[in-house]
A protein has these predicted regions:
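Secretory-pathway ectodomains
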Residues: 2, 10-14, 20-446
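A motif-centric signal for short, conserved binding hotspots located
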Residues: 7
């Protein structure tokens, strides 16, 4: 499991952790470029490169397709059939990998349904703007391709004993190097890649991208202690020169024992552990682990504490409320865009709010907040049976618990930004974009 998304999967310990969040995002001024594309039913994250946004969409017949969209206009450039072969439902629907190969030139790499013999799918690379096929590679099983700097990384044969991670040239498909085992890319630039090795004893590792030379290794258990199990899910983000990781708890169905969990930070230049927050669970929606994580501590008896917002750079508490301040049940978390207020949203009923800096109760009146549009999401069917689409946020008036009539764009801590563009899915699956940022920022989904 990987990036759980919606309430059974995304709220990593759902029942006791029912949580949500929000923002005071204002309606965008007219001078910000903005668009909507209702031709797609977005079910994956969106990747961006060379002025193109690529995503996985679900067609009306339940089949998946890879769609490329012009980032400036929101217009669909092309669409081709897509599939998954061996990806785990808790990881969410696979997004295409988008790699920029030159200014305004890029490659979109995705899994095509074409089968041949023992191969269950075909990895296919296409020109980002035209959809022209560049190369293919047969696939038995994989969690899907990822961009790693200027290359494509993918773990293949994931269902077999000879699983390995491969690094490919995006223009030719030539294998540059490989290593045994299954890994996920957590960060890369043009020279280095940092991966999470998915194993019984997971390890964060760094390599030189051009030749695979190992740079450093750091076992996750060195940060959090023994008993880590990735089955509960995980998430990573980058704050400056630090990689911040979150490992979720997993309760074994037979033994009832809960695995080790918490957050930690690693220096990317040498792999040294920077800070650790053991035994905290991340709540949803909230910011990327490296930017504005919101967590709840859990004691040895499994009792939840209050809520705390952490500084992703240092791990320090920036604001918190105690367990005794948490109001009963039936609420969803809500935050303004600055995340300085912690709100408890009740649908169609008055909510409550706390000033995070002081921990004191504050007025809910006038607070517009964002929460999951759907609190009981249904899994996708057909080609993505058991999977959930990425979540959508809706804006609510915290004082009444009702939706607002003119919501703006969801907050940046949720959407993130890619080259200044913020992209998000509405509850019907349409993709929206606005260029109101100036840089690239990680969002809730990375």
């Amino acid at each position: 499991l990987k990036r759980p998304h919606a309430l059974a999967l995304a709220l990593l310990t759902c029942g006791a952790l029912a949580a949500c969040s929000g923002s005071d995002a204002a309606i965008a001024p007219e001078n910000f470029p903005t668009w909507s594309n209702t031709q797609v039913n977005l079910v994956s994250r969106t990747t961006v490169g060379a002025g193109v946004a690529a995503l996985t969409s679900m067609r009306a017949d339940g089949a998946l397709e890879t769609v490329a969209i012009d980032l400036t206009s929101g217009k669909k450039l092309w669409a081709q059939p897509a599939t998954m072969a061996g990806r785990l439902p808790g990881m969410g629907v696979q997004a295409p990998a988008t790699v920029e190969t030159a200014p305004d030139q890029g490659v979109v790499v995705a899994l095509d349904p074409a089968k041949r013999g023992k191969w269950n799918a075909t990895l296919m690379a296409r020109e980002a703007r035209t959809g022209k096929q560049l190369w293919t590679r047969p696939v038995h099983s994989t969690f899907g391709p990822q961009r790693c700097g200027k290359f494509v990384c993918m773990s293949e044969h994931t269902a077999l004993a000879n699983a390995r991670m491969i690094v490919l040239d995006p223009l030719t498909g030539k294998m540059l190097w490989k290593m045994p085992g299954i890994a996920e890319v957590e960060w890369a630039d043009d020279q280095h890649v940092v991966i999470l090795r998915l194993a019984a004893n997971p390890v964060v590792e760094a390599y030189k991208l051009k030749d695979g030379k190992p740079l450093w290794q750091q076992p996750v258990q060195a940060a959090l202690g023994n008993g880590v199990d990735l089955s509960g899910g995980w998430a990573f983000g980058v704050a400056g020169d630090r990689l911040v990781g979150y490992i979720a708890p997993y309760t074994h169905p037979k033994s009832g024992k809960t695995s080790t969990f918490g957050m930690f930070s690693i220096r990317m230049n040498d792999g040294v552990i920077d800070w650790v927050r053991p035994s905290v669970v991340r709540v949803y929606p909230s910011g990327n682990p490296a930017v504005s994580p919101v967590v709840r501590p859990v004691d040895d008896e499994g009792t939840y504490g209050g809520f705390a917002r952490l500084d992703g750079s240092t791990g320090r508490v920036m604001g918190q409320i105690t367990a005794t301040q948490v109001p009963g049940s039936g609420w969803w978390l809500a935050f303004p865009s600055a995340m300085n207020t912690l709100g408890f949203l009740k649908h169609n009923a008055p909510g409550t709010a706390f000033d995070l800096s002081s921990g004191q109760a504050t007025q809910a009146k006038g607070v517009r907040s964002w929460s999951f549009c759907v609190t009981d999401p249904q899994p996708l069917g057909k080609a993505a049976a058991g999977f959930f689409s990425v979540a959508s946020l809706c804006e609510f008036d915290l004082a009444t618990g009702k939706r607002t009539t003119e919501p703006g764009a969801p907050p940046a801590w949720f959407t993130g930004a890619q080259n200044g563009w913020r992209l998000w899915r509405d509850e019907k699956g349409a993709l929206h974009g606005i260029k109101d940022a100036t840089t690239t920022l990680p969002g809730m989904y990375g």
